[in-house]
Swiss-Prot record:
Belongs to the eukaryotic ribosomal protein eL31 family. It comes from the Archaea. The keyword Transport does not apply. GO terms for biological process: translation. This is Large ribosomal subunit protein eL31. The lineage of its organism: Archaea, Thermoproteota, Thermoprotei, Desulfurococcales, Desulfurococcaceae. Keywords: Ribonucleoprotein, Ribosomal protein. The keyword Ribonucleoprotein applies. It comes from Staphylothermus marinus (strain ATCC 43588 / DSM 3639 / JCM 9404 / F1). GO terms for cellular component: ribonucleoprotein complex; ribosome. Gene3D superfamilies: 3.10.440.10. One of its GO terms (molecular function) is structural constituent of ribosome.
Length: 102
């Protein structure tokens, strides 16, 4: 975790495998809710959680029924405004693709 004044930055790997336990028809919806729940658990002081559209697009990229198993995000927590912003670092698919190209 790095701190620059009032903003705390941290990188998290959020596992989304629990959304596969339920019905197929709303897995991406539950994945977004799980991300919000994860951030709320780790940043208890956060009153507002903002999920970047890139994170949402990545979760929905393979349709509603097949969200990714995990997502790597950077969470920026502003202590004064008590907001947590969730930003996409990279997809695990991009990490695998770059490893295969070497």
């Amino acid at each position: 975790m790095s701190e620059e004044g009032k903003i705390t930055r941290s990188i998290h790997v959020i596992p989304l495998k629990r959304v596969y336990w339920g019905r197929r028809t709303n897995r991406a919806d539950r994945a977004v809710r799980l991300i919000r729940k994860y951030v709320r658990r780790h940043f208890k002081e956060a009153e507002k959680i903002i999920i970047d559209p890139a994170v949402n697009e990545y979760v929905w990229s393979r349709s509603r029924e097949k969200p990714p198993r995990r997502v790597i995000v950077e969470i920026r927590f502003d202590k004064e405004e008590k907001t947590a912003k969730v930003l996409l670092i990279r997809s695990s698919k991009a990490k695998i693709m770059s490893a295969n190209s070497k």
